[in-house]
């Protein structure tokens, strides 16, 4: 009895293993566009997006690609949030301080000017509910 159960389980496992490559190959490639507020010449800021894009592509075997566009290539630098809100692009890389005219609460997403230092900001975001509060603000704009 145990032998039959073992053989049945082994057979199902082998069938699943044989089918796995076919399932993996049928996964469609997804491409998202990321608009940045920063020019290519600002390697620290713009370069972070290209590194993210390369890392995501690598860990997904090229099945999820992020095309990075510098300021002005799709939308002007200060309209990245609008582009995400309107669905023009799937992702945006910008500073929330650019959008305090839309909602002054965007100021809490940045440390400029005279805000907390990087450790204080990380503590507020990840240990004091800051990220949840910012997500509520961003959600109003479909970001």
Could you tell me what each predicted segment is?
Residues 48, 52, 76, 80, ...:
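Stable alpha-helical elements in mature extracytoplasmic
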Residues 19-37, 58-64, 139:
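Immediate post-signal peptide segment of exported/extracytoplasmic ligand-binding proteins
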Residues 5-25:
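N-terminal export signals
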Residues 62-64, 80-94:
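Alpha-to-beta junction loops
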Residues 42-67, 128:
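Short, polar/charged alpha-helical segment
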Residues 66-84, 107:
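Extracytoplasmic small-molecule ligand-binding "clamshell" domains
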Residues 53-54, 95-143:
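Contiguous mixed-secondary-structure segments that line small-molecule binding/active-site clefts
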Residues 33-50, 71-75:
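Extracytoplasmic "Venus flytrap"
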């Amino acid at each position: 009895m145990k032998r039959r159960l073992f053989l049945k389980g082994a057979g199902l496992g082998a069938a699943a293993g044989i089918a796995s490559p076919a399932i993996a190959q049928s996964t469609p490639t997804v491409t998202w566009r990321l608009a940045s507020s920063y020019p290519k010449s600002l390697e620290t800021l713009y370069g972070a997006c290209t590194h993210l894009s390369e890392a995501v592509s690598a860990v997904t075997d090229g099945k999820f690609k992020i095309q990075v566009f510098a300021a002005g290539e799709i939308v002007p630098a200060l309209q990245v949030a609008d582009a995400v809100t309107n669905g023009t692009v799937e992702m945006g890389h910008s500073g929330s301080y650019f959008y305090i005219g839309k909602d002054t609460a965007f100021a809490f997403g940045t440390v400029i000017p005279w805000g907390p230092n990087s450790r204080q900001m990380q503590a507020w975001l990840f240990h004091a509910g800051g990220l949840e509060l910012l997500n509520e603000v961003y959600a109003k704009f479909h970001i």
